[in-house]
Amino acid sequence: MPRRREVPKREILPDPKFGSVELAKFMNVVMLDGKKAVAERIVYGALEQVQAKTGKEPIEVFSLAINNIKPIVEVKSRRVGGANYQVPVEVRPVRRLALAMRWLREAAKKRGEKSMDLRLAGELIDASEGRGAAMKKREDTHKMAEANKAFSHFRW
C-alpha cells in the first residue's frame, strides 16, 4: 500500500458543444502534443459525419459506441510457482471507460479513410452497431478471459 496520501482526481469540464464529460475525456485521449484545438476539430468533425451518415443524434451514437466497446473482464499475468497464468479479472469502471476510448482511437487510426475525422466517424458508427475493430478487440479480450476461466481462483 502506498504511504503517501491519495492524489485527488482532476475534474474534467464538459465539452462546450454537447455538454458531455465523456466526450471531453475522449478529446483528451485523441489529443496529441497538447493540441486540443486539433483534437476538438477531429472529434466534432467526426460527430458531424456521424449525423450526416446516420441521421441520428451524434452524442447518442458516441455513447452507444463507447458502451458497446467497454470490456467487462480482462486477463492479468500472475506468476505462481514458476509459471505465468493469465488470470481473468473484472475491469473497474474507470478503466473500462479508459480502455474503450483508447481502443476506439487506435481502431480509428488503423482504418483506411482519408482523414482522421472520417475514420473516427466510421469506427463510431461501426461500434454503435456492434461491429468494427474496436468491438473485435473487446470480443478478443472477453474470449481470453473465458479461455482462462480455470485460473480465476488465482485472483488476488
Curated annotation (Swiss-Prot):
Q: Which CDD domains match?
A: uS7_Bacteria (cd14869)
User: Record's Gene Ontology CC terms?
Assistant: small ribosomal subunit
Query: Which GO molecular function annotation, any one, does this entry have?
Result: rRNA binding
Name the keywords, alphabetized. Ribonucleoprotein, Ribosomal protein, RNA-binding, rRNA-binding, tRNA-binding
**Matching InterPro entries:** Ribosomal_uS7, Ribosomal_uS7_bac/org-type, Ribosomal_uS7_CS, Ribosomal_uS7_dom, Ribosomal_uS7_dom_sf
According to its UniProt entry, the protein's GO biological process terms are: translation
Q: Which domain of life is it from?
A: Bacteria
UniProt function note: One of the primary rRNA binding proteins, it binds directly to 16S rRNA where it nucleates assembly of the head domain of the 30S subunit. Is located at the subunit interface close to the decoding center, probably blocks exit of the E-site tRNA.
NCBIfam families (alphabetical): rpsG_bact
Query: What protein family does this chain belong to?
Result: Belongs to the universal ribosomal protein uS7 family.
HAMAP family given in the database record:
Ribosomal_uS7_B
Q: Report quaternary structure and partners.
A: Part of the 30S ribosomal subunit. Contacts proteins S9 and S11.
Protein name per Swiss-Prot or TrEMBL: Small ribosomal subunit protein uS7
